[in-house]
Amino acid sequence: MPSSPKERSLTAALEPSLDSFKCRRTLKADGVAYDYFSLKEAEANGLQGISSLPFSLKVLLENLLRHEDGRTVTADDIRAVALWLRERKSDREIAFRPARVLMQDFTGVPAVVDLAAMRDAMAALGGDPRKINPLAPVDLVIDHSVMVDAFGSGQAFQINVDKEYERNRERYAFLRWGAGAFDNFRVVPPGTGICHQVNLEYLAQTVWTKENGAGTIAFPDTLVGTDSHTTMVNGLSVLGWGVGGIEAEAAMLGQPISMLIPEVVGFRLTGALKDGVTATDLVLTVTEMLRRAGVVGKFVEFFGSGLGHLPLEDRATIANMAPEYGATCGFFPIDEETLTYLEATARKRNRIALVEAYARAQGLYRDGDTPDPAFTNTLHLDLSDVEPSIAGPKRPQDRVPLAHAAASFAEALDKEYGKAAEANLRVPVKGKNFDLGHGDVVIAAITSCTNTSNPSVMVAAGLLARNALQRGLRVKPWVKTSLAPGSQVVTDYLAEAGLQTDLDAL
């Protein structure tokens, strides 16, 4: 694992802001002074009403205040965010500079190749190639190269990892060279976990700091990533989303990302989930509702009393699914649960103190007395109305109540595939002593960042495996099983709970 990001400050060059709204101030957290660009002072100095903005737009506004240079970010750009409140939308384009970039190995290798090529060009021109480095910090997590060769045994994970190293030796050697050759570039090795889970548990800090000539500046953690599910970290109040490789490389080299000031759809949550209802059931319900509402190209921000009954892992599961419900991101504001999670995942005390102090000073902290922000429009879900669900047969937004699964399958077999007459057909498998038919489960995989990020559903899977074994149940010979924990933390708590053995047995 790379050196801890908890000790790491951003090192990219930061031009002094023009600070047209005279809002640079100082706060103290855990006895340490930090400079920051105060939204409250900016409101007092001309940006009227910005305290009513959605939390996600406040993060964008702070980004503009901090990077105001008169060229890529102007005072009029900043005013446009405040003017968003008039119609709750805008056609103004702004320049967003994320604090960092997250990559995985499939999309990250070309970026490292480009950096290496630029170094070669610099050397050919007689310059110092060591000057070619990412300006924004980059974390590349190797997680997209594993293939399931072995399955259904306790040795499957190690066998698959060994084969992964064997197949990708040249790529991994190249990435290891890049980690040593470039500043601001780190590589998380294979077998550590899924990039979004590693980001949530380890890399993200919610509030970042950077040494500046005049002191240490504190600001919201933001990022772009080369995977659509980068949005998962919005559950930890870190604004971020997936972009293409070219945009990611531009951000890596210090260039801003152009974007329209987005519409923000507020999603009010009330009540609490009933016993037996999982985060997966919730996220399928949310996805169905947002797909129906139409949120493509928009921010979604969650608010309401129901957040108090939603652990951060459940929030991350919902945020992870933003590509499926079509939004740019699904953002959760900082609150007590955020701080609890940062502490549970071993972020340092001074960092947690800074997150709370900064969020409260900026009006980015949500509690029971926080007024609802202004949104473009809103939706509402009572969590107690969520029921056990599955999705399919093709799309995650096609939610099916579990009680209706059999009828839904029969309908899909007829209307979507025209095979109602084959509903009871069984076909012998050559060389095997079993047959297959429509509706048979042939793959049982717990591998996605959406599922493996959530302890409640992972523990539920382990308990289900234990109960199945105790009743003498076994996996059918035609089912290919696989389990890829989202991080080493997941592996550890399954082992500590004694559930890994039960899962391995299946």
PLM features: what roles do these ranges have?
Residues 2-506:
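Fe-S-dependent hydro-lyases/dehydratases of central metabolism
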